[in-house]
Protein backbone atom coordinates (compact mmCIF):
# COMPACT_ATOMS: atom_id res chain seq x y z
CA UNK A 1 0.00 0.00 0.00
CA UNK A 2 1.17 3.53 -0.68
CA UNK A 3 0.66 7.00 0.78
CA UNK A 4 -2.22 7.73 -1.59
CA UNK A 5 -4.33 4.86 -0.31
CA UNK A 6 -6.85 4.80 2.52
CA UNK A 7 -7.69 2.16 5.09
CA UNK A 8 -11.03 2.29 6.85
CA UNK A 9 -11.43 0.24 10.02
CA UNK A 10 -14.99 -0.41 11.16
CA UNK A 11 -14.90 -1.09 14.88
CA UNK A 12 -12.69 0.61 17.45
CA UNK A 13 -12.21 -2.17 19.95
CA UNK A 14 -9.05 -4.12 20.72
CA UNK A 15 -8.81 -5.54 17.20
CA UNK A 16 -9.59 -2.36 15.28
CA UNK A 17 -7.34 -0.06 17.28
CA UNK A 18 -4.48 -2.55 17.15
CA UNK A 19 -4.53 -2.96 13.37
CA UNK A 20 -4.42 0.84 13.04
CA UNK A 21 -1.34 1.00 15.26
CA UNK A 22 0.27 -1.94 13.46
CA UNK A 23 -0.11 -0.22 10.11
CA UNK A 24 1.68 2.86 11.41
CA UNK A 25 4.35 0.65 12.99
CA UNK A 26 4.91 -0.83 9.52
CA UNK A 27 5.30 2.70 8.09
CA UNK A 28 2.02 2.92 6.21
CA UNK A 29 1.78 6.61 5.29
CA UNK A 30 -1.75 6.70 3.88
CA UNK A 31 -5.02 7.66 5.56
CA UNK A 32 -6.33 5.54 8.43
CA UNK A 33 -9.91 6.15 9.55
CA UNK A 34 -10.98 4.27 12.68
CA UNK A 35 -14.76 4.23 13.11
CA UNK A 36 -16.12 3.36 16.56
CA UNK A 37 -19.78 3.20 17.56
CA UNK A 38 -19.14 4.14 21.20
CA UNK A 39 -18.40 7.60 22.53
CA UNK A 40 -15.29 6.30 24.28
CA UNK A 41 -11.86 5.92 22.74
CA UNK A 42 -10.70 2.28 22.35
CA UNK A 43 -10.56 0.44 25.67
CA UNK A 44 -10.10 -3.00 27.20
CA UNK A 45 -13.31 -4.97 27.74
CA UNK A 46 -12.06 -7.89 29.89
CA UNK A 47 -11.70 -5.79 33.09
CA UNK A 48 -15.35 -4.69 32.90
CA UNK A 49 -16.52 -7.82 34.73
CA UNK A 50 -13.54 -7.87 37.07
CA UNK A 51 -11.29 -5.00 38.17
CA UNK A 52 -13.43 -2.19 36.73
CA UNK A 53 -16.67 -3.53 38.20
CA UNK A 54 -14.92 -4.05 41.52
CA UNK A 55 -13.71 -0.44 41.53
CA UNK A 56 -10.04 -1.38 41.29
CA UNK A 57 -9.60 0.35 37.91
CA UNK A 58 -11.16 3.49 36.44
CA UNK A 59 -12.21 4.27 32.89
CA UNK A 60 -8.96 6.09 32.13
CA UNK A 61 -6.88 3.03 33.02
CA UNK A 62 -8.88 0.90 30.57
CA UNK A 63 -7.82 2.93 27.53
CA UNK A 64 -5.64 1.00 25.11
CA UNK A 65 -3.66 4.14 24.28
CA UNK A 66 -3.86 7.76 25.46
CA UNK A 67 -6.25 9.82 23.33
CA UNK A 68 -3.50 12.02 21.94
CA UNK A 69 -1.68 9.03 20.43
CA UNK A 70 -4.24 8.67 17.64
CA UNK A 71 -3.74 12.24 16.46
CA UNK A 72 0.04 12.05 16.79
CA UNK A 73 0.09 8.93 14.59
CA UNK A 74 -2.27 10.39 12.04
CA UNK A 75 -5.12 8.03 12.85
CA UNK A 76 -8.52 9.68 12.43
CA UNK A 77 -10.59 8.28 15.31
CA UNK A 78 -14.30 8.90 14.74
CA UNK A 79 -16.41 8.11 17.81
CA UNK A 80 -20.17 7.48 17.98
CA UNK A 81 -20.07 6.52 14.30
CA UNK A 82 -22.48 3.88 13.06
CA UNK A 83 -21.75 2.26 9.70
CA UNK A 84 -25.08 1.56 8.04
CA UNK A 85 -23.96 -0.06 4.79
CA UNK A 86 -21.00 -1.36 2.84
CA UNK A 87 -20.79 -1.04 -0.95
CA UNK A 88 -18.13 -3.46 -2.17
CA UNK A 89 -18.44 -2.50 -5.83
CA UNK A 90 -18.05 1.20 -5.10
CA UNK A 91 -15.54 0.55 -2.27
CA UNK A 92 -17.16 2.84 0.26
CA UNK A 93 -19.05 2.67 3.54
CA UNK A 94 -22.16 4.70 4.32
CA UNK A 95 -22.61 6.05 7.83
CA UNK A 96 -25.94 6.44 9.58
CA UNK A 97 -25.87 10.17 8.79
CA UNK A 98 -25.62 9.30 5.06
CA UNK A 99 -21.93 10.27 4.82
CA UNK A 100 -20.08 8.07 2.33
CA UNK A 101 -16.38 7.34 2.88
CA UNK A 102 -14.31 5.53 0.26
CA UNK A 103 -11.59 2.99 0.98
CA UNK A 104 -8.80 1.13 -0.73
CA UNK A 105 -8.72 -1.50 2.03
CA UNK A 106 -11.44 -2.11 4.58
CA UNK A 107 -11.05 -3.88 7.92
CA UNK A 108 -14.19 -5.16 9.62
CA UNK A 109 -13.59 -5.35 13.37
CA UNK A 110 -17.17 -5.09 14.58
CA UNK A 111 -16.77 -7.61 17.40
CA UNK A 112 -19.67 -9.31 19.10
CA UNK A 113 -22.70 -8.37 21.18
CA UNK A 114 -24.55 -10.03 24.07
CA UNK A 115 -26.94 -12.75 22.96
CA UNK A 116 -30.57 -11.70 23.27
CA UNK A 117 -33.10 -13.96 24.92
CA UNK A 118 -36.86 -13.57 24.78
CA UNK A 119 -38.02 -13.51 28.39
CA UNK A 120 -41.02 -11.78 29.90
CA UNK A 121 -39.64 -8.98 32.08
CA UNK A 122 -36.30 -8.72 30.27
CA UNK A 123 -36.72 -4.94 29.91
CA UNK A 124 -37.43 -4.22 33.57
CA UNK A 125 -35.21 -1.69 35.31
CA UNK A 126 -32.43 -3.46 37.17
CA UNK A 127 -31.92 -6.10 34.47
CA UNK A 128 -28.42 -5.64 33.11
CA UNK A 129 -26.09 -6.87 30.39
CA UNK A 130 -22.36 -6.36 30.44
CA UNK A 131 -20.58 -5.35 27.26
CA UNK A 132 -19.62 -1.67 27.43
CA UNK A 133 -18.29 0.78 30.00
CA UNK A 134 -21.77 2.24 30.27
CA UNK A 135 -23.18 -1.23 30.98
CA UNK A 136 -20.57 -1.71 33.71
CA UNK A 137 -21.32 1.70 35.22
CA UNK A 138 -25.02 0.88 35.38
CA UNK A 139 -24.34 -2.46 37.04
CA UNK A 140 -21.79 -0.98 39.43
CA UNK A 141 -24.43 1.44 40.72
CA UNK A 142 -26.78 -1.47 41.42
CA UNK A 143 -24.48 -3.67 43.50
CA UNK A 144 -22.91 -3.31 46.89
CA UNK A 145 -23.33 -4.37 50.53
CA UNK A 146 -26.64 -6.10 51.14
CA UNK A 147 -27.57 -6.31 47.46
CA UNK A 148 -28.53 -9.67 45.99
CA UNK A 149 -27.68 -10.17 42.32
CA UNK A 150 -28.96 -12.97 40.11
CA UNK A 151 -26.70 -14.06 37.24
CA UNK A 152 -28.64 -15.66 34.39
CA UNK A 153 -25.91 -17.71 32.76
CA UNK A 154 -23.03 -19.65 34.28
CA UNK A 155 -20.27 -18.86 31.81
CA UNK A 156 -17.07 -16.96 32.51
CA UNK A 157 -18.76 -13.55 32.57
CA UNK A 158 -21.38 -14.79 35.01
CA UNK A 159 -18.75 -16.23 37.35
CA UNK A 160 -16.54 -13.14 37.13
CA UNK A 161 -19.45 -10.84 37.93
CA UNK A 162 -20.48 -13.10 40.81
CA UNK A 163 -16.97 -12.82 42.25
CA UNK A 164 -17.03 -9.03 41.90
CA UNK A 165 -20.46 -8.80 43.56
CA UNK A 166 -19.31 -10.83 46.56
CA UNK A 167 -16.10 -8.82 46.75
CA UNK A 168 -18.19 -5.65 47.08
CA UNK A 169 -20.19 -7.08 49.97
CA UNK A 170 -23.22 -8.31 48.06
CA UNK A 171 -24.56 -11.79 47.47
CA UNK A 172 -24.84 -13.65 44.18
CA UNK A 173 -26.82 -16.54 42.79
CA UNK A 174 -25.87 -18.11 39.46
CA UNK A 175 -28.69 -19.64 37.41
CA UNK A 176 -27.59 -22.02 34.65
CA UNK A 177 -29.77 -24.22 32.44
CA UNK A 178 -26.99 -26.77 31.85
CA UNK A 179 -26.17 -29.29 34.56
CA UNK A 180 -22.89 -27.53 35.35
CA UNK A 181 -21.31 -24.12 34.98
CA UNK A 182 -18.98 -23.45 32.03
CA UNK A 183 -20.56 -26.35 30.15
CA UNK A 184 -19.04 -26.52 26.69
CA UNK A 185 -16.14 -24.18 27.46
CA UNK A 186 -14.34 -25.91 30.34
CA UNK A 187 -13.56 -29.44 31.48
CA UNK A 188 -15.55 -31.02 34.28
CA UNK A 189 -12.63 -30.76 36.76
CA UNK A 190 -12.24 -27.03 36.11
CA UNK A 191 -15.99 -26.44 36.18
CA UNK A 192 -16.36 -28.31 39.47
CA UNK A 193 -13.33 -26.58 40.99
CA UNK A 194 -14.59 -23.09 40.21
CA UNK A 195 -18.07 -23.88 41.47
CA UNK A 196 -16.65 -25.09 44.79
CA UNK A 197 -14.42 -22.02 45.02
CA UNK A 198 -17.43 -19.76 44.55
CA UNK A 199 -19.60 -21.73 46.97
CA UNK A 200 -16.85 -21.49 49.60
CA UNK A 201 -17.18 -17.70 49.28
CA UNK A 202 -20.95 -17.67 49.53
CA UNK A 203 -22.12 -17.79 45.90
CA UNK A 204 -25.25 -19.88 45.34
CA UNK A 205 -25.79 -22.04 42.26
CA UNK A 206 -28.93 -23.33 40.59
CA UNK A 207 -27.99 -25.60 37.68
CA UNK A 208 -30.12 -27.66 35.34
CA UNK A 209 -32.99 -25.17 35.63
CA UNK A 210 -34.94 -23.04 33.18
CA UNK A 211 -35.84 -19.38 33.59
CA UNK A 212 -39.53 -18.79 32.91
CA UNK A 213 -39.64 -15.02 33.37
CA UNK A 214 -38.21 -12.06 35.21
CA UNK A 215 -40.58 -10.64 37.78
CA UNK A 216 -40.82 -7.08 38.98
CA UNK A 217 -42.76 -4.47 40.88
CA UNK A 218 -43.35 -0.88 39.79
CA UNK A 219 -41.19 -1.43 36.73
CA UNK A 220 -38.15 -2.83 38.57
CA UNK A 221 -36.87 -6.39 38.85
CA UNK A 222 -37.63 -8.24 42.07
CA UNK A 223 -36.82 -11.83 41.16
CA UNK A 224 -36.31 -14.62 38.64
CA UNK A 225 -39.15 -17.12 38.25
CA UNK A 226 -37.88 -20.57 37.33
CA UNK A 227 -39.58 -23.16 35.17
CA UNK A 228 -40.50 -25.20 38.25
CA UNK A 229 -42.20 -22.07 39.67
CA UNK A 230 -39.54 -21.34 42.28
CA UNK A 231 -38.82 -17.65 42.77
CA UNK A 232 -35.24 -16.40 43.14
CA UNK A 233 -35.49 -12.96 44.78
CA UNK A 234 -32.94 -10.35 43.69
CA UNK A 235 -32.25 -6.63 43.71
CA UNK A 236 -30.59 -6.78 40.28
CA UNK A 237 -30.13 -9.32 37.53
CA UNK A 238 -27.42 -9.76 34.92
CA UNK A 239 -28.21 -11.68 31.75
CA UNK A 240 -24.98 -13.23 30.47
CA UNK A 241 -25.81 -16.05 28.09
CA UNK A 242 -23.02 -15.67 25.56
CA UNK A 243 -22.39 -13.45 22.56
CA UNK A 244 -23.10 -13.39 18.84
CA UNK A 245 -20.78 -11.89 16.20
CA UNK A 246 -21.75 -8.59 14.58
CA UNK A 247 -21.75 -9.94 11.03
CA UNK A 248 -24.72 -7.95 9.74
CA UNK A 249 -22.69 -5.41 7.76
CA UNK A 250 -20.64 -8.12 6.05
CA UNK A 251 -23.54 -10.47 5.34
CA UNK A 252 -25.63 -7.63 3.86
CA UNK A 253 -22.70 -6.94 1.52
CA UNK A 254 -22.62 -10.56 0.35
CA UNK A 255 -19.72 -11.91 2.42
CA UNK A 256 -19.85 -15.37 4.02
CA UNK A 257 -20.59 -14.91 7.70
CA UNK A 258 -23.28 -17.16 9.14
CA UNK A 259 -21.46 -17.73 12.44
CA UNK A 260 -18.56 -15.39 11.79
CA UNK A 261 -17.00 -13.74 8.75
CA UNK A 262 -14.91 -16.39 7.01
CA UNK A 263 -11.28 -15.30 6.60
CA UNK A 264 -7.99 -16.89 5.54
CA UNK A 265 -4.59 -17.01 7.25
CA UNK A 266 -4.07 -13.32 6.46
CA UNK A 267 -7.47 -12.33 7.92
CA UNK A 268 -8.63 -11.58 4.37
CA UNK A 269 -12.22 -12.26 3.32
CA UNK A 270 -13.44 -13.52 -0.05
CA UNK A 271 -13.17 -9.88 -1.19
CA UNK A 272 -9.43 -9.15 -1.59
CA UNK A 273 -9.91 -5.54 -0.47
CA UNK A 274 -11.69 -6.48 2.76
CA UNK A 275 -10.18 -7.96 5.92
CA UNK A 276 -11.98 -9.04 9.10
CA UNK A 277 -10.43 -9.51 12.53
CA UNK A 278 -11.39 -10.38 16.09
CA UNK A 279 -14.61 -11.74 17.55
CA UNK A 280 -16.52 -11.27 14.29
CA UNK A 281 -14.48 -13.86 12.37
CA UNK A 282 -14.31 -17.57 11.69
CA UNK A 283 -10.70 -18.44 10.91
CA UNK A 284 -8.41 -21.35 10.04
CA UNK A 285 -6.37 -22.70 12.94
CA UNK A 286 -2.86 -23.45 11.60
CA UNK A 287 -1.83 -25.43 14.68
CA UNK A 288 -4.85 -27.69 14.20
CA UNK A 289 -4.60 -28.61 10.51
CA UNK A 290 -6.39 -25.39 9.46
CA UNK A 291 -9.65 -26.38 11.06
CA UNK A 292 -12.10 -23.46 10.92
CA UNK A 293 -13.04 -22.02 14.29
CA UNK A 294 -14.57 -18.90 15.81
CA UNK A 295 -12.20 -17.61 18.49
CA UNK A 296 -13.43 -14.82 20.74
CA UNK A 297 -10.57 -13.55 22.86
CA UNK A 298 -8.21 -10.60 23.08
CA UNK A 299 -5.11 -12.62 22.04
CA UNK A 300 -6.93 -13.74 18.90
CA UNK A 301 -7.88 -10.14 18.09
CA UNK A 302 -4.27 -9.06 18.44
CA UNK A 303 -2.97 -11.93 16.32
CA UNK A 304 -5.40 -11.24 13.50
CA UNK A 305 -4.65 -7.51 13.64
CA UNK A 306 -0.98 -8.32 13.02
CA UNK A 307 -1.90 -10.72 10.21
CA UNK A 308 -4.09 -8.17 8.43
CA UNK A 309 -1.56 -5.35 8.75
CA UNK A 310 1.24 -7.55 7.42
CA UNK A 311 -0.86 -8.67 4.45
CA UNK A 312 -1.88 -5.11 3.57
CA UNK A 313 1.74 -3.99 3.71
CA UNK A 314 3.09 -6.96 1.76
CA UNK A 315 5.10 -8.16 4.75
CA UNK A 316 5.75 -11.82 5.67
CA UNK A 317 2.91 -13.53 7.48
CA UNK A 318 3.50 -13.63 11.26
CA UNK A 319 4.16 -17.02 12.79
CA UNK A 320 1.07 -18.78 14.20
CA UNK A 321 0.36 -18.17 17.87
CA UNK A 322 -1.21 -20.51 20.38
CA UNK A 323 -4.73 -19.32 21.22
CA UNK A 324 -5.19 -18.54 24.88
CA UNK A 325 -7.62 -17.03 27.35
CA UNK A 326 -7.63 -15.97 30.99
CA UNK A 327 -10.08 -15.27 33.80
CA UNK A 328 -9.68 -13.80 37.28
CA UNK A 329 -12.19 -14.84 39.93
CA UNK A 330 -11.58 -13.82 43.54
CA UNK A 331 -7.87 -14.52 44.04
CA UNK A 332 -7.83 -17.30 41.43
CA UNK A 333 -6.08 -16.96 38.08
CA UNK A 334 -7.45 -19.23 35.38
CA UNK A 335 -5.38 -19.57 32.18
CA UNK A 336 -6.30 -21.69 29.19
CA UNK A 337 -4.30 -22.39 26.04
CA UNK A 338 -5.24 -24.24 22.88
CA UNK A 339 -8.50 -25.76 21.68
CA UNK A 340 -9.37 -29.37 22.61
CA UNK A 341 -10.52 -30.45 19.13
CA UNK A 342 -11.43 -34.16 19.26
CA UNK A 343 -9.49 -34.66 22.52
CA UNK A 344 -10.28 -38.03 24.08
CA UNK A 345 -8.01 -38.02 27.13
CA UNK A 346 -7.84 -35.59 30.04
CA UNK A 347 -4.75 -35.71 32.24
CA UNK A 348 -4.68 -33.89 35.58
CA UNK A 349 -1.43 -32.61 37.02
CA UNK A 350 -1.82 -31.61 40.62
CA UNK A 351 -4.87 -32.06 42.81
CA UNK A 352 -7.85 -29.70 42.42
CA UNK A 353 -8.76 -30.39 46.04
CA UNK A 354 -5.39 -29.00 47.11
CA UNK A 355 -5.56 -25.82 45.03
CA UNK A 356 -3.36 -25.17 42.01
CA UNK A 357 -3.68 -27.72 39.21
CA UNK A 358 -3.65 -28.15 35.46
CA UNK A 359 -5.67 -30.26 33.03
CA UNK A 360 -4.12 -31.38 29.75
CA UNK A 361 -6.44 -32.29 26.86
CA UNK A 362 -4.84 -34.93 24.63
CA UNK A 363 -5.42 -37.15 21.64
CA UNK A 364 -3.01 -39.95 20.71
CA UNK A 365 -0.51 -38.48 23.16
CA UNK A 366 -0.54 -35.03 21.56
CA UNK A 367 -1.30 -32.06 23.82
CA UNK A 368 -4.13 -30.07 22.24
CA UNK A 369 -5.07 -27.75 25.10
CA UNK A 370 -4.32 -27.03 28.74
CA UNK A 371 -6.39 -25.48 31.52
CA UNK A 372 -4.63 -24.16 34.61
CA UNK A 373 -5.55 -22.61 37.93
CA UNK A 374 -2.75 -20.70 39.66
CA UNK A 375 -0.21 -22.76 37.71
CA UNK A 376 1.76 -20.34 35.51
CA UNK A 377 4.58 -22.79 34.78
CA UNK A 378 2.16 -25.43 33.52
CA UNK A 379 0.38 -22.80 31.43
CA UNK A 380 3.60 -21.59 29.80
CA UNK A 381 4.81 -25.16 29.26
CA UNK A 382 1.44 -26.18 27.86
CA UNK A 383 1.57 -23.40 25.29
CA UNK A 384 4.94 -24.66 24.11
CA UNK A 385 3.68 -28.24 23.95
CA UNK A 386 0.79 -27.12 21.76
CA UNK A 387 3.05 -25.03 19.54
CA UNK A 388 5.53 -27.89 19.12
CA UNK A 389 2.75 -30.49 18.78
CA UNK A 390 4.40 -32.45 21.57
CA UNK A 391 3.53 -36.10 22.07
CA UNK A 392 3.80 -37.22 25.70
CA UNK A 393 2.67 -40.05 27.92
CA UNK A 394 0.19 -39.69 30.76
CA UNK A 395 2.88 -40.90 33.14
CA UNK A 396 5.18 -38.02 32.21
CA UNK A 397 2.51 -35.40 32.77
CA UNK A 398 1.17 -36.65 36.09
CA UNK A 399 4.56 -37.37 37.69
CA UNK A 400 5.35 -34.43 40.02
CA UNK A 401 9.03 -35.43 39.96
CA UNK A 402 9.21 -34.50 36.28
CA UNK A 403 9.63 -30.77 35.76
CA UNK A 404 6.86 -29.63 33.45
CA UNK A 405 9.20 -27.18 31.75
CA UNK A 406 11.45 -30.09 30.74
CA UNK A 407 8.52 -31.66 28.90
CA UNK A 408 8.03 -28.58 26.74
CA UNK A 409 11.42 -28.68 25.01
UniProtKB/Swiss-Prot annotation:
Cofactor: FAD
GO cellular component, one term: cytoplasm
Keywords: FAD, Flavoprotein, Oxidoreductase
Pathway: Terpene metabolism; monoterpene degradation
Assigned EC number: 1.-.-.-
Protein function: Involved in the degradation of the cyclic monoterpene limonene. Probably part of an electron transfer system involved in the oxidation of limonene to perillyl alcohol.
Protein name: Probable ferredoxin reductase CtmF
Organism annotation: Castellaniella defragrans (strain DSM 12143 / CCUG 39792 / 65Phen) (Alcaligenes defragrans)
Amino acid sequence: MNANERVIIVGAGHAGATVAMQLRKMDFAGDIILLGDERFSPYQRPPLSKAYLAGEEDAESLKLWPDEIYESKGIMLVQSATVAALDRAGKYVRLADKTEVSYDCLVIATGSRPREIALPGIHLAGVHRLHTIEDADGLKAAIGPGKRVALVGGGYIGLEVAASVVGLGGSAVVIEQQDRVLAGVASVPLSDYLRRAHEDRGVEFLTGVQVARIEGSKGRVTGIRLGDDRLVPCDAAVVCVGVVPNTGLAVAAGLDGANGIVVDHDARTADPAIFAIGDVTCRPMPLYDDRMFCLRSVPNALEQAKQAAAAMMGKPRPKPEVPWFWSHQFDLKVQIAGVPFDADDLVLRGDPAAGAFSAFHMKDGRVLAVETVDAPLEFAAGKQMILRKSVLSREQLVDPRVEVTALAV
